[in-house]
A protein has these predicted regions:
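Accessory N-terminal region flanking or inserted into the helicase ATPase core
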Residues: 1, 11, 27, 71-155, ...
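P-loop NTPase Walker
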Residues: 1-69
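Alpha-helical scaffold elements adjacent to nucleotide-binding pockets in ATP/GTP-utilizing enzyme cores
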Residues: 15, 40-44, 54-62, 147, ...
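Active-site catalytic microenvironments for nucleophilic, acid-base chemistry
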Residues: 18-22, 44, 65, 133, ...
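Alpha-helix N-cap/helix-start capping motif
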Residues: 35, 56-57, 138, 218, ...
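Hydrophobic "anchor" residues on beta-strands that sit immediately upstream
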Residues: 50, 150-151, 180-181
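Conserved RecA-like helicase ATPase core segment
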Residues: 168-244
Length: 245
C-alpha cells in the first residue's frame, strides 16, 4: 500500500521485471483496471511471458473454453433467487437444457452488451459468473495456477469483491503454488463497485496478505504531503523524498 506519489506503478513494474529476470520461464499475469493502464505496463516491461489485461479480460480468458460448465453455471444462477442481476425475459425458472434445445447452437460469449437469451454476457454478469465458477469448479483454480505462478493486481482498491474472493479465497484452496500481489491505496478508490480495502485478508499467517507500506512521496511538495497525512485514516504517514522541498 502507498499513498499518491509513492511510486506504486513504478514499484509494480520493477517487481514484475525482477520476477521475470529471476524466473525467466514462468508466466506472470498483471491485472489492471483500464486498457490505458494495460498498454502502459506492457510498454514499460515488454516481455513475452507477461500477460497484462483488464479484470474482465483476465476472467473471461480463463473460463471461456469451458462451455459446458458455463452453460450449467448460467442456468444455476438464473434459478437462484438471490441473484437478481441474471434473468431471462419473464421466465421464473430456466430448464437445465435451455441452451441445448435452441434451434441454433449457442456458445456463451462475452461482449459489451447483454443478451442472455442468446448466451451473451456483459461486464457485471461476467463477474458473478466467474465467482460462481471458481467457487464450484476447483479445477479452474489449478488451471490458473498452472498457467501463472505470479499474479499482480494494479489499483486493487477498485477491484470488485468477486475478483478478490477468487484470488484470496478460492485459488488458495488447492495445493499448487501461486504468489499474488496487490498494489494500490485504499484511500484512492474511485469506483463504488470496488472492494476499497483488503484489511480482512491481512495478517502474518499462512495464506494471509502481508502489507508492505510505501511511505516515501516522490511527487508532492512537503506542504501537500503534510495535509494529506492529516486526511488519511489508514495509518500510512508519508514522508517527502530527499529531493523534495
Amino acid at each position: 500500500s502507498g499513498g499518491a506519489g509513492s511510486g506504486k506503478t513504478y514499484s509494480l513494474v520493477q517487481v514484475i521485471k525482477q520476477v521475470l529476470t529471476s524466473n525467466p520461464t514462468v508466466k506472470v499475469a498483471c491485472i489492471t483496471y483500464t486498457n490505458a493502464a494495460v498498454k502502459e505496463i506492457e510498454e514499460r516491461v515488454n516481455h513475452k511471458n507477461l500477460n497484462v489485461s483488464t479484470i474482465h479480460d483476465f476472467l473471461w480468458d480463463n473460463i471461456k473454453h469451458f462451455q459446458k460448465e458455463l452453460k450449467e453455471s448460467l442456468i444455476a444462477l438464473f434459478n437462484d433467487e438471490d441473484v437478481k442481476q441474471l434473468k431471462i425475459d419473464d421466465l421464473t425458472s430456466v430448464p437445465s437444457d435451455y441452451y441445448e434445445n435452441r434451434e441454433e447452437p449457442v456458445s456463451i460469449q462475452y461482449k459489451e452488451y447483454l443478451k442472455l437469451r442468446d448466451g451473451i454476457i456483459s461486464h457485471d454478469e461476467l463477474l458473478i459468473l466467474s465467482e460462481y465458477m471458481f467457487r464450484k469448479y476447483w479445477k479452474l483454480c489449478d488451471i490458473v495456477k498452472d498457467k501463472y505462478k505470479f499474479i499482480f493486481i494494479d489499483e486493487y482498491q477498485d477491484t470488485h469483491e468477486e475478483v478478490v474472493k477468487i484470488l484470496l479465497e478460492y485459488l488458495p484452496r488447492t495445493t499448487k503454488k501461486c504468489i499474488i500481489g496487490f498494489f494500490g491505496d485504499a484511500m484512492q478508490a474511485i469506483y463504488d463497485t470496488g472492494i476499497g480495502d483488503i484489511d480482512a485478508y491481512k495478517g502474518d499467517g499462512k495464506g494471509q496478505v502481508k502489507e508492505v507500506k510505501k511511505v516515501q512521496n516522490r511527487r508532492n511538495p512537503r506542504a501537500v504531503i503534510t495535509l494529506a497525512n492529516r486526511l488519511r485514516t489508514d495509518g500510512i504517514i508519508q514522508e517527502a523524498s530527499g529531493d523534495i522541498t
